[in-house]
Curated annotation (Swiss-Prot):
HAMAP family: PurH. One of its GO terms (biological process) is 'de novo' IMP biosynthetic process. The IMP cyclohydrolase activity resides in the N-terminal region. This is Bifunctional purine biosynthesis protein PurH. Residues 1-144 form the MGS-like domain. Pathway: Purine metabolism; IMP biosynthesis via de novo pathway; 5-formamido-1-(5-phospho-D-ribosyl)imidazole-4-carboxamide from 5-amino-1-(5-phospho-D-ribosyl)imidazole-4-carboxamide (10-formyl THF route): step 1/1; Purine metabolism; IMP biosynthesis via de novo pathway; IMP from 5-formamido-1-(5-phospho-D-ribosyl)imidazole-4-carboxamide: step 1/1. Gene3D superfamilies: 3.40.140.20, Methylglyoxal synthase-like domain. It holds the Pfam family MGS.
Length: 492
């Protein structure tokens, strides 16, 4: 007779599942509350003590941690030595393990939870049985999710529990135990902090630090101000990423994950002034990052406006004295070294995506002029600035830039012409030195026409459209210089 071990905290569906197992001639073994629930419903069940010949002890902390349990789960039924060991030690094989775990996450979600409450809800025997049975999935069926009960029964009835399905159950187990262990780490670790709320007040949120190096947001040295909010953290990370792209003194202002003003200069105060002038309206309440020490002159400029967060590699004593006069502003020191092997993760329904960060640096030498007109030296400098910025703007993205600053940004539009029109509408200046940078190619020549109508004389774009020549021909017709990078910078 096949044997099943049932030990569940979530008893959803366990009674009808157990009844159907007995109909399929499974002998049931169970522990504690699960055994009582089965007995209360007149289902024949034996205690695991009959397998272990050892009672539950220590308030149930030790009941399944026994060689007779794990030998019965882990034995390779095709290995004669394993079968012999089972016979020698009186170990009975277990064919089905049904386990779900103490509700640790639900317990610690209670704001009044104590550390002892959390500790008592750390399951030990459950994860151990799950991992043992999942490892031996070719011989043992492992069920961690009540949603799988019906399908398991049907496959048992039709003898279609093939290796593919068993492996699916195995993967679900290790995903579950991984998440369970992560929840424990997150609760007890100093690397996890509960935020006031998430993107909106009705959303709960936490900040989990996985890498607290001094050049990361997680490793920031907080000099002043209240804790960062969820939105502060996201915006600060976007700001930090962009400002690190620049070698010369640079300042970046971000609102809602998009740069609103980027400036460079001979000194950092000039860079900030250029970033401010790029969009003096949108910078209000924004996040600013600078890649040089904040000095007195720069601090005085920033003190005059409302900013949520200022990030820099260092603040002078005079700058700190000026800026800390504002109680609510956050001041963070972060090193400006760029990690060369960073990955980024994006959660999606049922999983997550992983990709390398967009760190590719395209220089003038990598670009090619595709029109009769060549860019001027001032336009080349604007190309380099605009191309650095456009990869940090949500697609479809258009950035207008001169050799010192962005002058107009069109972000997150469903079509490229729309992004160009917004950038042009918001432009603080328009002259022969202003360059239009596009994160993606032009599928037709309408963006060139829009640029020409606004007086733009130079365009940089990736190229790669089957209609590239249409855009090139239109640029030649209008006397516009066009440069292609052969690199796309979509940002979703």
């Amino acid at each position: 007779m096949r044997k099943a071990l049932l030990s569940v905290s979530d008893k959803t569906g366990i009674i009808p599942f157990a009844e159907r197992l007995t109909e399929l001639d499974f002998e049931l073994y169970s522990t504690g509350g699960t055994k009582k629930a089965l007995e209360d419903n007149d289902i024949a069940v034996k205690s695991v003590s009959e397998l272990t010949n050892f009672p539950e002890i220590m308030d149930g902390r030790v009941k399944t941690l026994h060689p007779n349990i794990h030998g019965g789960i882990l034995a390779d039924r095709n290995n004669p030595e394993h079968i012999k060991a089972m016979e020698t030690h009186g170990i009975q094989p277990l064919d089905l393990v049904v386990v779900n775990l103490y509700p640790f996450e639900a317990t610690v979600a209670n704001p009044d939870v104590t550390e002892m409450d959390a500790i008592e809800n750390i399951d030990i025997g459950g994860p151990t049985m799950l991992r043992s049975s999942a490892k031996n999935f070719r011989h043992v069926i492992t069920v961690v999710d009540p949603a799988d009960y019906d399908e398991v029964i049907e496959k048992l009835k039709t003898d279609t529990l093939d290796e593919t399905f068993r492996k699916q159950l195995m993967i679900k187990v290790f995903t579950h135990t991984n998440k369970y262990d992560a929840a424990i780490v997150n609760f007890f670790s100093d690397n996890t902090s509960t935020l006031r709320y998430g993107e909106n007040p009705h959303q709960k949120a936490r900040f989990i630090k996985t890498d607290a190096k001094p050049n990361t947001l997680a490793g920031a040295r907080v000099l002043h101000g209240k804790p960062l909010s969820f939105n502060n953290i996201k915006d600060a990370d976007a700001t930090l990423f962009l400002v690190k792209q620049f070698d010369m003194p640079a300042a970046v202002a971000v609102k809602h994950m998009n740069p609103c003003g980027v400036g460079t200069g001979e000194v950092i105060s000039e860079a900030f002034q250029n970033a401010y002038d790029a969009d003096s309206q949108s910078i209000f309440g924004g996040i600013v990052a600078l890649n040089r020490e904040v000095d007195k002159a720069t601090a005085e400029k920033m003190h005059a406006i409302f900013l949520e967060v200022i990030i820099a590699p260092k603040f002078s004593d005079e700058a700190l004295e000026i800026l800390t006069a504002k109680k609510n502003i956050r001041l963070l020191e972060i090193d400006m070294d760029m990690d060369k092997d960073e990955e980024e993760f994006v959660s999606v329904s049922g999983g997550y995506l992983v990709q390398d960060k967009d760190l590719l640096n395209v220089t003038r030498e990598d670009m090619r002029v595709v029109t009769n007109t060549e860019p001027t030296e001032a336009q080349w400098k604007a190309i380099e600035l605009g191309w650095k910025v456009v990869k940090s703007v949500k697609s479809n993205a258009i950035v207008l830039a001169n050799d010192k600053q962005t002058v107009g940004i069109g972000a997150g539009q469903m079509n490229r012409v729309g992004a160009a029109k917004i950038a042009i509408e918001r432009a603080i200046e328009m002259n022969d030195n202003v360059v239009l940078a596009s994160d993606g190619f032009f599928p037709m020549s309408d963006t060139v026409e829009t640029a020409y109508a606004a007086g733009i004389k130079c365009i940089v774009q990736p190229g790669g459209s089957i209609k590239d020549q249409d855009s090139i021909d239109k640029a030649n017709e209008y006397g516009i210089a066009m440069v292609m990078t052969d690199v796309r910078h979509f940002k979703h």
